[in-house]
A protein has these predicted regions:
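A short small-residue
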Residues: 30, 99-107, 146-152
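Residues that form generic nucleotide/phosphate-binding pockets
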Residues: 11, 22, 59, 63, ...
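Hydrophobic alpha-helical core bundles mediating ligand binding, dimerization, or RNAP-core interactions
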Residues: 16-19, 53, 119, 123-126
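Short, Lys/Arg-rich amphipathic segments at extreme N-termini
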Residues: 12-31
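Acidic/histidine-rich alpha-helical segments that form the ligand environment
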Residues: 82-137
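Short, contiguous alpha-helical
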Residues: 33-90, 124, 131-132, 136-185
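Extreme N-terminal tail/first-helix region
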Residues: 1-17
């Protein structure tokens, strides 16, 4: 197993375990409580991650089967490393807010109370999909963002973006949990 693969899968697994241990005991009311009209609930944070990550599945499946070729843009974009690093660094800054780029990944207001279990299953699934791309060259395989069609980044950066995005929303959910008016039961 290459070191990138083991690092990414370990970090992804760690996020899933932390989410299960921190939020797995919460009630439906707690999962769906919002800190304000514009704020997301804990459940919405994790529903959003599932929806977002699933947008990469078709690409990952094609990469793992060896059926995917870089597009012309992906082959010749001089900015792939720049965009990858930009996204990674932006996701690390919690103060910077992003608006979801497409309604497809905006979670509904009411989230199923078993979202933590669903997220745990999702983490297992995405880790398996990442492992299946082990034989691809993560530095030479360039993918296009499912949200901004002119933004490309290396597969290695794509995986780092997934991890940073998950960690960002984990921190957001922790802030909701620590909010002054968060329901105790």
């Amino acid at each position: 197993m290459n070191s990138n693969l083991s690092n990414i899968t370990a970090e992804t697994k760690e996020v899933g375990q932390k989410i299960e241990s921190t939020f797995g005991h919460l009630s439906a009311a707690q999962i769906n409580w919002k800190p304000g009209a514009d704020g997301w609930s804990i459940g919405q944070c994790f529903e959003h991650l599932i929806k977002t990550n699933e947008l990469f599945y078709a690409e990952l499946d094609n990469i793992s089967k060896g059926e995917r070729k870089n597009s012309l843009l992906e082959n010749y974009s001089p900015l792939s490393s720049f965009f990858g690093n930009l996204m990674i660094n932006s996701l690390k800054k919690d103060a910077r807010k992003f608006k979801a780029p497409t309604p497809k990944i905006v979670p509904p207001s009411e989230i199923d109370a078993n979202i933590i279990e669903l997220f745990a299953a999702h983490q297992t699934e995405i880790i398996e999909k990442i492992k299946q791309t082990e034989n691809a060259d993560w530095q030479k395989t360039v993918i296009t963002s499912p949200f901004m069609k002119l933004m490309t980044y290396r597969l290695a950066d794509g995986y780092r973006i997934v991890v940073e995005h998950e960690q960002r929303h984990l921190r957001q959910a922790e802030r909701v949990l620590q909010a002054e008016n968060f329901p105790k039961e």
